[in-house]
């Protein structure tokens, strides 16, 4: 029998949204609730299901990406609940650190961007033309939210998977009402097509996954932190001037949460006060027991993806 659980806050497991989280109370109450949607609580749920619904029979687990993180949490605290485990692209670095993750993934994202432009040379100028148009500050997506160069950069989030490069290329091909957006083709103020703006919104919307960016950096928080997370990706971004939205070629960002997302996205904006509090917190549930993992006797097979954009292969192999 295959069991595919909806993790806390997703699917039919009391789906979380800005509206439902707001009902929890003030920003502090919301932040504390969001902490209950992380790995330690998810694994407790799975262990409860194992004991109450499956007669205590040990699982054989398969964890992809974040599922691998959950696997190590499970093996840390309830190893008796697992007969064997398999992970794919999902061995977190232990001890975990959001800062370390982004220090590794931003150089990978720069390389992915350059590879994309090498494959589609015309897209370097086209992406720059879109960014230049957005820099005027008067472009909105169909939901009314501002479309900025920083939001444009986040379209690179899919470049770690196939066929994302092809999709991004096709998207840019429809960007402008006239030509490629250059002054020679479209004049001094090129217009973006409605179809392009809608496709961008469909790519960026968090309507179906509000927790994805909300909890992005907190999945690395393990117990008592030495220092608050304080927008780790934002700090790493600032360390790389080539990623500045005014720099050319325009570099794209990957799986990284930024504070502007919680200002520009109307579905995330209500969560910003709670997320800001979490960014200053240093007390989280412990999610990995290094001693237990070092003594692990449960069979574990791990597949590590070469040049993984999301879970750095170097950190996985360390």
Regions found by a protein language model. Name each.
Residues 1-143, 267-272, 285-287, 291-292, ...:
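Gly/Pro-rich cap/lid or specificity-loop segments adjacent to the active site
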Residues 38, 276-282, 306:
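Short, flexible loop segments at the rims of nucleotide/cofactor-binding pockets, characterized by
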Residues 39, 258-259, 302:
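Generic secretory/membrane-interface signal
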Residues 63, 156, 304:
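Pocket-edge structural micro-motifs
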Residues 138-281:
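Alpha/beta-hydrolase fold active-site neighborhood
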Residues 164-168, 308-315:
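Conserved alpha/beta-hydrolase "acid-adjacent" motif
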Residues 296, 301-304:
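Short beta-strand/loop motif that positions the catalytic acidic residue
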Residues 318:
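Catalytic histidine neighborhood in serine/cysteine hydrolases
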